[in-house]
UniProtKB/Swiss-Prot annotation:
Gene3D superfamilies: N-terminal domain of the delta subunit of the F1F0-ATP synthase. Belongs to the ATPase delta chain family. This is ATP synthase subunit 5, mitochondrial. One of its GO terms (molecular function) is proton-transporting ATP synthase activity, rotational mechanism. The gene is ATP5. It is found in: Mitochondrion inner membrane.
Amino acid sequence: ASAAPIKPPVQLFGLDGTYATALFSASAKDSSIEKTFQSVQKLSSTISKDAKVAQVLSNPALSLNSRKEVVSVLSKELKLEPVVSNLLTVLAENNRLSLFDSIAKQFSVLNDAYNGVVEATVVSAKPLDSKILNRLTKSITNSKYVGPGKTLKIKNEVDPEILGGLIVEVADKSVDLSLASKVNKLNKVLSETI
């Protein structure tokens, strides 16, 4: 009797999410999630660095045989894990190789969740320096949003429209401490009293 399948740690939606979930399940069966993740990263890196590879993968006019040949060459050259090669073959057969980049991003989400990594996004009007990011990391790591045994991965996004302050998003929670939201609340109160 085979072991029970490992359930993906988070539910993903959309076609790219479906493919990423299938890739995760297949690699979990082989106990090769980490190797699969490395293969996916290697291919993503190749696509982002080599414009010709990116162009070929996103060309819907390629014949099925040409797409399969591209998959075969990439698999051999990059020494991709068999589950990643199989995914590419399925994508080639369905003329969906252009989805690989978004599938890779979704697979990264699954891999992070599987490894206990919680992603936080901090939106600020200007880029934050490392001292502030370290304080935020420490503060968020010790909060109820991360939990024991989890690792925090923090990302700083810049949006000048928030004027100042921060918007912190951890998992599915969001705290808006931006100057723009305070101004909007003040405007709303003022317009209601007039």
